[in-house]
Design a protein with these regions (language model features):
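Short helix-capping/hinge SLiMs at alpha-helix to coil transitions
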Residues: 17-21, 67-68
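Alpha-helical residues within the helix-turn-helix
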Residues: 31, 48-49
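Key DNA-contact positions within bacterial/archaeal DNA-binding proteins
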Residues: 38
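C-terminal regulatory/oligomerization modules of transcriptional regulators
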Residues: 94-148
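Beta-hairpin "wing" of winged helix-turn-helix
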Residues: 50-65
Length: 148
């Protein structure tokens, strides 16, 4: 399973802003995180609309987090940047076969598990993992649980 480029780039950008802790220009974020600048600007609009970042226009403008890194989850970023409609808004067949109902139930269960897991990981968790990476690698431990 892979994230869309928009989600991965958005996570890179928001994590960079969390690490810096100050206003960063779009050029700085794009260069440091290897994100095409025009694409970053589009993603930043979505992240701003979702209340994840502040965007200040102008010569001394740029981006910063709109709230503390411990209050922004991976799910928040994912939801801000994905284009899919939530499963609850998708058209379901009224007279669905048992097979279709089973498939829908399985997909819904996977989606719920993924959302629960992603909501448990905050930007602060990711920053701590980056800072602890060397000791984690040496000890063989991981900071994030692997879904069973």
């Amino acid at each position: 399973m892979h994230f869309k480029a928009s989600v991965e780039y958005g996570m890179r950008a928001v994590l960079y802003l969390a690490e810096k802790g100050s206003i960063c220009s779009s050029r700085e974020v794009a260069d440091e995180m290897s994100i095409p600048r025009d694409y970053l600007i589009q993603l930043a609009q979505l992240l701003r609309n979702a209340g994840i970042i502040h965007a200040r226009p102008g010569k001394n403008g740029g981006y910063s987090l709109a709230k503390d890194a411990s209050n922004i989850s991976m799910l928040d970023i994912f939801n801000a940047l994905q284009n899919d409609r939530p499963r609850s808004e998708r058209k379901e067949a009224e007279d669905a076969s048992d097979l279709l109902q089973d498939i829908t139930a399985a997909c819904s269960a996977v989606e719920r598990e993924m959302e629960e897991y992603m909501s448990s990981i905050t930007l602060q968790n990711m920053i701590e993992r980056i800072h602890d990476k060397e000791s984690d690698t040496a000890s063989g431990s991981t900071r994030f649980r692997t879904p069973a």
